[in-house]
């Protein structure tokens, strides 16, 4: 804040997907503490959606018991209701849902954020969950689909996980540099 102009806010790094027991109280306490020690600087969270691609620790590419859009809306309505006074923005990770679900989930996320006066961003994952190899840089067409869905839903900001490995020209993955170049070309960046 006032002491260091380069410090503009807080990322509350607990990543959840559903209404985990105690999460509302925990996020509220962390958000309040961040605001209290910094004179009210903004806070944000970046949860994941418990979609069909949420298969960590397995050899599967998808799962059957994914959260529905309606369940997601119900659970996050309750979470946002309990944290909106100390959490200013939410950037849902987009990699655990399928491409044909982006619009439905993004629309619900934006609606809920607007209801509670929160900012709604996207966290565009730049690695591919559709491959049997964990993890390679995503193809630009897939990244573009995610960003366009976020734009259709009215999001005004996008962050990414994870630039240094999956999109940086300095990455060990040659594809990462190509993804970066395609991104720059698409957005006419020098």
Model-derived features: positions:
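Glycan-processing catalytic domains of CAZymes
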Residues: 1-190
């Amino acid at each position: 804040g006032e002491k260091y102009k380069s410090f503009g806010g807080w990322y509350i790094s607990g990543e959840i997907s559903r209404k985990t027991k105690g999460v509302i109280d925990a996020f509220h306490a962390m958000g309040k503490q961040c605001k209290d020690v910094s004179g009210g600087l903004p806070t944000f969270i970046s949860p994941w959606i418990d979609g069909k691609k949420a298969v960590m620790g397995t050899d599967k590419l998808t799962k059957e018991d994914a959260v529905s859009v309606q369940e997601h809306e119900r659970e996050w309505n309750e979470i946002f209701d309990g944290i909106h006074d100390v959490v200013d923005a939410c950037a849902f990770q987009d990699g655990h849902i399928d491409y044909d679900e982006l619009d439905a989930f993004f629309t619900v996320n934006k609606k809920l954020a607007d209801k509670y006066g929160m900012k709604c961003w996207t966290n565009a994952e730049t690695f591919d969950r559709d491959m049997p190899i964990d993890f390679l840089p995503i193809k630009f067409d897939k990244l573009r689909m995610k960003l366009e869905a976020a734009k259709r839903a009215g999001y005004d900001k996008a962050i990414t996980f994870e630039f240094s490995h999956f999109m940086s020209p300095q990455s060990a993955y040659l594809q990462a540099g190509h993804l970066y170049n395609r991104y720059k070309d698409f957005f006419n960046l020098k």
